[in-house]
Amino acid sequence: MARNMAHILHILVISLSYSFLFVSSSSQDSQSLYHNSQPTSSKPNLLVLPVQEDASTGLHWANIHKRTPLMQVPLLLDLNGKHLWVTCSQHYSSSTYQAPFCHSTQCSRANTHQCFTCTDSTTTRPGCHNNTCGLLSSNPVTQESGLGELAQDVLAIHSTHGSKLGPMVKVPQFLFSCAPSFLAQKGLPNNVQGALGLGQAPISLQNQLFSHFGLKRQFSVCLSRYSTSNGAILFGDINDPNNNNYIHNSLDVLHDLVYTPLTISKQGEYFIQVNAIRVNKHLVIPTKNPFISPSSTSYHGSGEIGGALITTTHPYTVLSHSIFEVFTQVFANNMPKQAQVKAVGPFGLCYDSRKISGGAPSVDLILDKNDAVWRISSENFMVQAQDGVSCLGFVDGGVHARAGIALGAHHLEENLVVFDLERSRVGFNSNSLKSYGKTCSNLFDLNNP
């Protein structure tokens, strides 16, 4: 009897062992399949964020993948914004959302020392906790600001795989702001829920990506002119040979990049030096410096135009009043007078499209000590304001303009602009991508894998 029992127990042990191995193997296979379909946490060389233009506002936006489970969140592209902010008061659901306590290391990293108390709701929810960090967010279009809750959650972004978009990679504790809902109610494209800040600040998108993945401190912007096709932002070194398979279609464009020094203001904004604007062979140099205060990082005491802000939150390039007056006068002198018609706001100089079939004069930005010239394509400075009416796409910013020149999104479209933060320089092509037979939508493969 005892011998039979021992034999039965031996068989049971063997059976259970095989069952355990089978279940364990099945579980591992299932887990592997699950992870293969999910964002990976590997270290990429290059990250890609597709960007679209909004036809009604002329501004650009991107779908950011956030939360758990991941979902797309449409956000305005704000080149000079300090951080990513999104409204959280409605429909924010995530199992990985956290609100760091006041005076925590996350608060220090975000450079905020203000505590936040929620008064909007009697129950806690994303964006509404007490004794958390307060973070001030701004709508860059309306200039409205509001205090919100510093938060952290999962963010995912595409890596590259050969010449294609690769799997998504995750930042598990990405810092951002849950901002007041009123900030997203005016000025933004429809359905956009916040803004994506790329300024030089501790928790801007690119700085968190650089830190988490160990990428070179460089990002490149290529904005599409067409709302039906994507442009892109690339994070990392596009000149790295390891990325050649992905950028193979743009090697000639990269080879011809011209670089000019980059200046970053105390607010983390991006400026380049502009010595003059040239219309055909005529230079536009104002007699008075347009800047408000000599303490500005972009102030120059000479008669030069000075620092030009690069921005994506103005659809058109904005000139201070003194520069605008001289520039439009010189431009008008190089256009047929009989073609000029009543201006259509917000522009100051418009023409009958049928009477300017000969084209517009060339417009160049003369940059760093005349060594670099950025030619603005007529497609980037002439705007179809109405049927049959084409306007000069520059806007009068008044006497209190933030900068002498603010290069707007329309100016940047169909240009590859490289922000090399490690070497404090900006790269661009002297001519638009059209001269290479390319557009921002086909310069890189932006199709989902």
Curated annotation (Swiss-Prot):
Presence of keyword Disulfide bond: yes
Induction (free text): By sulfur deficiency.
InterPro entries on file: Aspartic_peptidase_A1 (IPR001461), PEPTIDASE_A1 (IPR033121), Peptidase_aspartic_dom_sf (IPR021109), TAXi_C (IPR032799), TAXi_N (IPR032861), Xylanase_inhibitor_I-like (IPR033868)
Chief localization: secreted
Compartments reported by the entry: Secreted, Extracellular space
A GO term, aspect molecular function: aspartic-type endopeptidase activity
Glycosylation sites: N130
Domain spans labelled Peptidase A1: 60-429
Site description Cleavage, residues in chain: S295, S296
PROSITE patterns in the cross-refs: PEPTIDASE_A1 (PS51767)
Biotechnology: May be used in antidiabetic therapies and diets for type 2 diabetes (T2D).
Signal peptide: 1-33
Any one cellular-component term (Gene Ontology): extracellular region
Pfam families, per database record: TAXi_C, TAXi_N
Record-stated family: Belongs to the peptidase A1 family.
Note: Capable of reducing glycaemia in mammals.
Subunit structure: Two-subunit monomeric unit made of alpha and beta subunits coupled by disulfide bonds (at pH 4.5 and under non-reducing conditions). Can also form oligomers including dimer, tetramer and cyclic hexamer (trimer of dimers) (at pH > 5.5). Component of globulins complexes which accumulate in seeds. Interacts with flavonoids (e.g. apigenin glucosides) present in globulins complexes. Forms a static complex with vitexin.
Task performed by this protein: Sulfur-rich seed storage protein that remains undegraded at germination.
Protein name per its UniProtKB record: Gamma conglutin 1
Species this chain originates from: Lupinus angustifolius (Narrow-leaved blue lupine)
